[in-house]
Amino acid sequence: HLSLRRQRQMCIRDRISSDPALLATLGPPDLLEQYADESFTGYYTENPAAVFMGMVWWNNAWIALQCVLFGITGLWPINVLVQNAMGLGVSGAVMAAHDQVDVMILYILPHGLLEMTSIFVAAAGGLHLFWSWVAPGHRSRGESLAAEGRSLATVAIGLVFALFVSGLIEGFVTGWSLPWPIKIGIGVAALAAFLIYMLVIGGRAYRRGETGDLVEYEAGTPRLLAG
């Protein structure tokens, strides 16, 4: 299903980029050309690096927070992913129409590897929260939702730090005049560190029985038992 979805997105992007009528619906030709030739790359350098880093960190953290907070609905995380995919697809169509796809890829890869992975993890966490009350198992829906919500707080804290790192890369690396292999290498290293922490270190903790939830004393006794 994911591969079919990607194929549809690529077909839509290719259709827009190759169809002048569809491309015209995105804006006047001169503005689209300016976006492809100047605005897309200028976005990364038009503000001081520290200010820009703070802006993108806040924006990405807010997107991730929405996925977590409203994940209980089951719809909002999907909506966030679709909206972001559409925005990226439109940018890709404009850049493709002006033969600038390579520029777009180079400017997105350094920070985008970790950033996009973090957003997908946030969406997955939100959907897991939704599933916790749809299929609570042996627990009541309230107990299941409370336990998974407390565990998800650990994920949210980790994502704040991950998005801080991707913000640092976007603010201080992506727009720098460094060789692209170095920039992309920094992004790959950041993603590798994130995946190692999540899958290797986190996997070991999970196999030991760690869930990220509070112990019963800290969380409060869920029910009184008669004896």
Describe the predicted segments one by one.
Residues T45-W76:
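Individual transmembrane alpha-helix segments
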Residues H1-S3, M53-G54, I78, L109:
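Generic secretory/membrane-interface signal
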Residues I63, L69-G227:
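Generic detector of multi-pass transmembrane helix bundles and their immediately adjacent loops
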Residues R13-E38, Q83:
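Interfacial/capping segments of alpha-helical transmembrane domains
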Residues H1-I12:
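Single conserved hydrophobic/aromatic residue that forms the stacking wall/gate
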Residues L32-M55, I105-L114:
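Short aromatic-rich membrane-water interface segments that cap or initiate transmembrane helices
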Residues R8, D30-A36, G87, A93, ...:
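Charged, low-complexity, helix-prone segments enriched in Lys/Glu/Asp/Gln
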